[in-house]
């Protein structure tokens, strides 16, 4: 995390993830040594190797723990959630931290630090003003589903952008070119957004995801108590629902259930869904027994990942 005023690098992805983990453990009254699985999603790890999840393990003081890292943006936290859910359900592990964490500011700092804001290109301003750093997680324990008389969770994920250029491309640090060649580029790291493409195609990805999850889970929109979709009420997004195939009646039903906090935290990649979920829970919009849909849309290759579940965490402080 980079301080936008001073340019000082203050916090890494794993440090943010660990801070969120400690907060969750304290809320739940769980000791760190009870954790036997960490599943972390990020597109901005501390290093290529070791994976950031192992640094969370280290910072929590866990000598021995299973770790899995999902390399993804917005969809990663939902994918990580399903991985952990399955491993807990079959008894492989007992208690898991499912983390989404993203530190985007170190990638964006060269765009604006020490520069006159008026001389920053408009497309770069959109990137700087849109993204944020963050980390959030779900602490999961035990088996769920039919053993408790509830519907089993349903998961689905797809990439709809196999024949399209990426809606988001983060360049640098990969193997597309030798490092010496990468260092000759104007920026070692760069985020490139296809703003028109994402505005036009993004809502279609969302609508496809909604229909897919409802079909697989045999639920109707009216059955959902909450739809955690970080960008669901964004004007540029919601204005395209009709063109993407969502009826006005379904739009009205959906808008009453959407839980998001984009205007509060910005676009936070892997952290977006768990941050919105946490906000909805703390605000009382998500209550024990609610049927919840977690749905993430990622512009990189126009992916979605969704998971239906029954929320059973008590209100904060209870």
Model segments located where?
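Claisen-condensing/thiolase-fold acyl-transfer catalytic domains that form or cleave C-C bonds
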Residues: 14, 18-21, 44-45, 63, ...
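Flexible, glycine-rich active-site loops centered on histidine and acidic residues
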Residues: 89-131
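Conserved active-site "lid/cap" helical segment
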Residues: 1-36, 173-223, 236, 240, ...
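Active-site-adjacent elements of ketosynthase-type condensing enzymes
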Residues: 47-54, 103-120, 158-178, 234-242, ...
């Amino acid at each position: 995390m980079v301080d936008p005023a001073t340019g000082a690098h203050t916090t890494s992805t794993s440090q943010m993830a660990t801070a969120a983990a400690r907060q969750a453990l304290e809320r739940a009254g769980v000791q760190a040594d009870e954790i036997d699985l960490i599943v972390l999603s990020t597109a901005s790890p501390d290093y290529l190797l070791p994976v950031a999840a192992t640094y969370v393990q280290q910072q929590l003081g866990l000598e021995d723990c299973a770790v899995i890292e999902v390399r993804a943006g917005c969809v990663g936290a939902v994918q990580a959630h399903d991985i952990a859910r399955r491993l807990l359900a079959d008894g492989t592990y007992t208690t898991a931290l499912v983390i989404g964490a993203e530190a985007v500011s170190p990638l964006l700092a060269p765009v604006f630090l020490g520069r006159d804001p008026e001389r920053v290109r408009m497309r770069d301003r959109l990137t700087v003003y849109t993204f944020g750093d963050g980390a959030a997680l779900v602490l999961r324990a035990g088996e769920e589903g039919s053993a408790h008389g509830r519907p089993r969770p349903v998961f689905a994920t797809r990439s709809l952008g196999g024949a399209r250029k990426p809606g988001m491309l983060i360049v640098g640090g990969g193997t597309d070119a030798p490092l010496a060649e990468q260092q000759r580029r104007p920026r070692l790291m760069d985020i490139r957004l296809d703003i028109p493409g994402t505005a036009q195609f993004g809502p279609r990805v969302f609508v496809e995801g909604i229909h897919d999850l409802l079909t697989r889970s045999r639920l109707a929109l009216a059955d959902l108590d909450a739809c955690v979709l970080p960008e669901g009420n964004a004007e540029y997004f919601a204005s395209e629902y009709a063109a993407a195939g969502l009826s006005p009646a379904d739009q009205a039903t959906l808008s009453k259930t959407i839980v998001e906090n984009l205007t509060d935290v910005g676009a936070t990649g892997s952290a977006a869904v768990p941050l919105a979920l946490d906000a909805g829970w703390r605000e009382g919009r998500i209550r024990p027994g609610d049927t919840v849909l977690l749905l993430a849309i990622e512009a990189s290759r126009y992916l979605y990942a969704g998971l239906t579940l029954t929320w059973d965490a008590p209100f904060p402080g209870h």
